[in-house]
Amino acid sequence: MAQKKAGGSSRNGRDSAGRRLGVKKFGGETVVAGNIIIRQRGTKMKPGSNVGLGRDHTIFALVDGHVKFERRAEGRVHVSVEALPVAAE
Protein backbone atom coordinates (compact mmCIF):
# COMPACT_ATOMS: atom_id res chain seq x y z
CA MET A 1 0.00 0.00 0.00
CA ALA A 2 1.48 3.26 -1.07
CA GLN A 3 0.86 5.84 1.62
CA LYS A 4 2.09 9.36 2.38
CA LYS A 5 1.93 11.01 5.79
CA ALA A 6 0.33 14.43 6.05
CA GLY A 7 2.87 17.24 5.53
CA GLY A 8 3.52 19.74 8.30
CA SER A 9 2.32 23.30 7.95
CA SER A 10 4.66 26.02 6.70
CA ARG A 11 6.61 27.97 9.30
CA ASN A 12 6.21 31.25 7.41
CA GLY A 13 3.15 33.44 7.09
CA ARG A 14 3.52 35.96 9.92
CA ASP A 15 4.38 39.65 9.77
CA SER A 16 4.06 42.51 12.23
CA ALA A 17 2.69 45.95 11.49
CA GLY A 18 5.13 48.84 11.07
CA ARG A 19 5.81 50.90 14.21
CA ARG A 20 5.22 54.35 12.63
CA LEU A 21 8.62 55.69 13.69
CA GLY A 22 10.33 58.79 12.33
CA VAL A 23 10.12 62.56 12.26
CA LYS A 24 6.60 63.87 12.92
CA LYS A 25 7.40 67.61 12.87
CA PHE A 26 10.09 68.90 10.52
CA GLY A 27 12.48 71.85 10.84
CA GLY A 28 10.73 75.22 10.94
CA GLU A 29 7.32 73.75 11.75
CA THR A 30 5.36 75.31 14.60
CA VAL A 31 4.72 73.04 17.60
CA VAL A 32 2.63 73.30 20.74
CA ALA A 33 3.96 72.07 24.09
CA GLY A 34 3.42 68.30 24.21
CA ASN A 35 3.62 67.73 20.45
CA ILE A 36 5.68 64.70 19.44
CA ILE A 37 8.57 65.74 17.19
CA ILE A 38 10.33 62.37 16.66
CA ARG A 39 9.52 58.75 17.47
CA GLN A 40 12.65 56.60 17.46
CA ARG A 41 14.28 53.43 18.78
CA GLY A 42 17.28 54.52 20.84
CA THR A 43 18.63 58.06 20.70
CA LYS A 44 19.41 58.37 16.98
CA MET A 45 18.69 62.06 17.51
CA LYS A 46 19.41 63.75 20.84
CA PRO A 47 17.24 66.26 22.70
CA GLY A 48 18.35 69.91 22.71
CA SER A 49 16.74 72.87 24.46
CA ASN A 50 13.01 73.08 25.20
CA VAL A 51 12.36 69.41 24.36
CA GLY A 52 11.87 66.34 26.52
CA LEU A 53 12.88 62.71 26.07
CA GLY A 54 10.28 60.03 26.78
CA ARG A 55 11.14 56.62 28.19
CA ASP A 56 10.76 55.13 24.69
CA HIS A 57 13.18 57.84 23.39
CA THR A 58 10.38 59.93 21.88
CA ILE A 59 11.39 63.60 21.58
CA PHE A 60 8.57 66.04 22.37
CA ALA A 61 8.15 69.81 22.72
CA LEU A 62 8.13 71.38 26.21
CA VAL A 63 7.19 74.87 24.97
CA ASP A 64 5.33 76.39 22.03
CA GLY A 65 7.70 77.35 19.21
CA HIS A 66 9.49 76.29 16.03
CA VAL A 67 11.42 73.03 15.54
CA LYS A 68 15.15 73.33 14.87
CA PHE A 69 17.53 70.52 13.85
CA GLU A 70 21.27 71.10 14.31
CA ARG A 71 24.29 68.88 13.71
CA ARG A 72 26.75 69.26 16.58
CA ALA A 73 30.52 68.61 16.69
CA GLU A 74 30.20 65.00 17.90
CA GLY A 75 28.23 64.19 14.74
CA ARG A 76 24.84 63.69 16.39
CA VAL A 77 21.76 65.65 15.37
CA HIS A 78 20.18 67.61 18.22
CA VAL A 79 16.53 68.65 18.11
CA SER A 80 15.47 71.88 19.80
CA VAL A 81 12.42 74.12 19.95
CA GLU A 82 12.93 77.87 19.60
CA ALA A 83 10.30 79.35 21.91
CA LEU A 84 7.78 81.80 20.49
CA PRO A 85 7.84 85.27 22.10
CA VAL A 86 5.15 85.61 24.76
CA ALA A 87 2.47 88.15 23.78
CA ALA A 88 2.22 91.16 26.12
CA GLU A 89 -1.21 91.69 27.65
UniProtKB/Swiss-Prot annotation:
- Give the matching Gene3D superfamilies: 2.40.50.100
Establish whether keyword Ribonucleoprotein is in the entry: yes
Where along the sequence do coiled-coil regions lie? none
Which SUPFAM superfamilies does the UniProt record give? Ribosomal L27 protein-like
Q: What Pfam families has UniProt attached to this entry?
A: Ribosomal_L27
Q: Keywords for this entry?
A: Ribonucleoprotein, Ribosomal protein
Kindly provide the name given to this protein in its UniProt entry: Large ribosomal subunit protein bL27
